């Protein structure tokens, strides 16, 4: 059975692109993450991938990372499935610029 994953591409600690993919196995997910990271790192050496997996309670949780720097801050280690409906805003939500209610966060 396919599982749903969100692959977040980080460059210098900020989310710059997000992909929503389905994978049959954990191995396939890890291969996708490695391939995506290799492609991005060809252009940006400071890139890493963080993978979120859809859980049974309809939330996405961090489940895997590739070349993810420990000094990078993760604003969202989990988020509800409803957040993905605003897929274009997902990078801003993961960067902590916007909350799930589309409200801009001033820091």
Positions of PLM-derived features:
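Hydrophobic beta-strand residues in large extracellular and virion-surface proteins
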Residues: 5-9, 29, 33, 49-51, ...
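Secreted/extracellular small peptides and ectodomain modules produced from precursors
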Residues: 14, 21, 32-35, 61
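Short aromatic-glycine-(Arg/Gly/Cys) micro-motifs in beta-strand/loop hairpins
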Residues: 1-17
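A short, charged, amphipathic alpha-helix used as a generic interaction element across diverse proteins
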Residues: 24-45
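Short, mixed-charge low-complexity intrinsically disordered segments
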Residues: 38-107
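Conserved aromatic
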Residues: 20-27, 84
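Eukaryotic scaffold repeat domains enriched in small/polar residues
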Residues: 18-19, 46
């Amino acid at each position: 059975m396919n599982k749903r994953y969100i692959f977040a591409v980080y460059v210098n600690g900020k989310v710059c692109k997000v992909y929503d993919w389905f994978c049959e196995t954990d191995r396939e997910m890890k291969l996708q993450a490695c391939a995506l990271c290799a492609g991005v790192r060809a252009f940006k050496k400071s890139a890493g991938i963080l993978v979120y997996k859809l859980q049974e309670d309809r939330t996405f949780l961090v489940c895997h990372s590739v070349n993810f720097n420990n000094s990078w801050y993760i604003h969202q280690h989990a988020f509800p499935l409803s957040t993905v409906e605003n897929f274009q805003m997902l990078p801003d939500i993961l960067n902590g610029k916007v909350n799930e209610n589309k409200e801009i966060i001033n820091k």
